[in-house]
């Protein structure tokens, strides 16, 4: 039976009602109907799982804390089990509070390091609002991070990254080069809670159709409306290859061509470069593989804080994919079309 005729026998949802009760869009209630019986649960459960697991967001992945004393001496907190001088809470509690900060970077930025100092003479409480810098927006500004004594002076440095799901401190520590930097567990998901229910609804003479009611709560980093759109797009992308799977030969051939082109738009973060190299490239507005290979070694060497070690690392990483600095786009596409597996 042709696909078009097959779908005509199904009742497809025609109405989506959206209720927003928060000014920032962090809560949304969606009523979608009508579905054929059983499809409400299928679609609702699928969207819920994708929303909770696969929506990307921002998290603090590492921190460095230094205490400055009156006698000009200083102490750097070496691990999560070391105490922060002048702070009432232990370091583990401070870290737990930091992981609850809801923030995001400026559009297009995926990595940023922020630094600031706090004196107990100015404030006795470190709050999430202290993390708000140029290019960093914080959504729960009143969250208390730590309680400070009057004579404490602290210097903080934090690494903010863009990602998905949960990343352990062990994984984050692989990208740290400096000593006395504490890697943190990171929860990138901006989704706080998702619930759904299925009710009966009437279509014509039949009252056994499904009405799907979904409620989404976010941290404010993304609106509930954008979150459900993104989740639906993710599901669609995963199911799309199954639609024409009988044409696997031609699909595979086309995919090889298009995927090699798409790889030039791949984020340089997927090259597993060191934090230092990534930061230097970001300052030069190099964010994709295509932008990286368009640069030559001389251009990169002139970048501030870009050393020989970083250059050697980049050359080695590109070489593992048979690419090199100063390579033309045409040559790169030719190489990548024969080796599209590097995106997997």
Swiss-Prot record:
Region (Alpha N-terminal domain (alpha-NTD)): 1-246
Stated name of the protein: DNA-directed RNA polymerase subunit alpha
Any one cellular-component term (Gene Ontology): cytoplasm
Role summary: DNA-dependent RNA polymerase catalyzes the transcription of DNA into RNA using the four ribonucleoside triphosphates as substrates.
A GO biological-process term: DNA-templated transcription
Lineage start: Bacteria, Pseudomonadati, Spirochaetota, Spirochaetia, Spirochaetales
Region (Alpha C-terminal domain (alpha-CTD)): 259-344
Reaction equation(s) it catalyzes: RNA(n) + a ribonucleoside 5'-triphosphate = RNA(n+1) + diphosphate
Domain of life: Bacteria
An MF annotation (GO) of this entry: DNA binding
InterPro entries, per the entry: DNA-dir_RNA_pol_insert, DNA-dir_RNA_pol_RpoA/D/Rpb3, DNA-dir_RpoA, RBP11-like, RNAP_asu_C, RNApol_insert_sf
Annotated CDD domains: RNAP_alpha_NTD
Keywords associated with the record: DNA-directed RNA polymerase, Nucleotidyltransferase, Transcription, Transferase
Self-association state and partner proteins as the record states: Homodimer. The RNAP catalytic core consists of 2 alpha, 1 beta, 1 beta' and 1 omega subunit. When a sigma factor is associated with the core the holoenzyme is formed, which can initiate transcription.
Catalytic EC class: transferase
NCBIfam families: PRK05182.1-2, PRK05182.2-5, rpoA
EC number: 2.7.7.6
Protein family according to the UniProt entry: Belongs to the RNA polymerase alpha chain family.
Written domain comment of the UniProt record: The N-terminal domain is essential for RNAP assembly and basal transcription, whereas the C-terminal domain is involved in interaction with transcriptional regulators and with upstream promoter elements.
């Amino acid at each position: 039976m042709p696909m078009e005729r097959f779908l005509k026998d199904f009742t497809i949802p025609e109405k989506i009602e959206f209720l927003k009760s928060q000014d920032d869009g962090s809560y949304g209630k969606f009523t979608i109907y009508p579905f054929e019986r059983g499809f409400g649960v299928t679609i609702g459960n699928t969207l819920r799982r994708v929303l909770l697991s696969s929506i990307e967001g921002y998290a603090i992945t590492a921190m460095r804390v230094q205490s400055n004393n009156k006698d000009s001496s200083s102490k750097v907190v070496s691990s999560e089990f070391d105490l922060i001088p002048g702070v009432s809470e232990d370091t583990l509690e401070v870290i737990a509070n930091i992981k609850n900060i809801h923030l995001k970077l400026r559009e297009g930025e995926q990595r940023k390091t922020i630094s600031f100092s706090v004196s107990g003479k100015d404030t006795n409480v470190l709050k999430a609002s202290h993390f708000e810098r140029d290019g960093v927006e914080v959504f729960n500004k009143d969250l208390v991070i730590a309680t400070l004594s009057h004579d404490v002076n602290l210097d903080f440095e934090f690494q903010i990254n863009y990602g998905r799901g949960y990343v352990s401190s062990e994984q984050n520590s692989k990208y740290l080069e400096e000593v006395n930097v504490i890697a943190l567990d990171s929860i990138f998901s901006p989704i706080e809670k998702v619930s759904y229910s299925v009710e009966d609804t009437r279509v014509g003479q039949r009252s056994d159709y499904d009405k799907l009611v979904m409620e989404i709560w976010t941290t404010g980093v993304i609106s509930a409306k954008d979150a459900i759109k993104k989740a639906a797009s993710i599901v669609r992308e995963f199911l799309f290859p199954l639609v024409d799977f009988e044409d696997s030969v031609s699909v595979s051939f086309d995919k090889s061509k298009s995927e090699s082109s798409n790889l030039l738009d791949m984020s340089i973060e997927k090259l597993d470069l060191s934090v230092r190299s990534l930061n230097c490239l970001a300052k030069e507005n190099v964010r994709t593989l295509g932008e990286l290979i368009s640069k030559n070694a001389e251009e990169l060497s002139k970048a501030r804080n870009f050393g020989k070690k970083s250059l050697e690392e980049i050359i080695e990483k590109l070489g593992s994919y048979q690419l090199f600095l100063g390579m033309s786009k045409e040559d790169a596409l030719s190489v990548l079309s024969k080796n599209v597996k590097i995106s997997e």
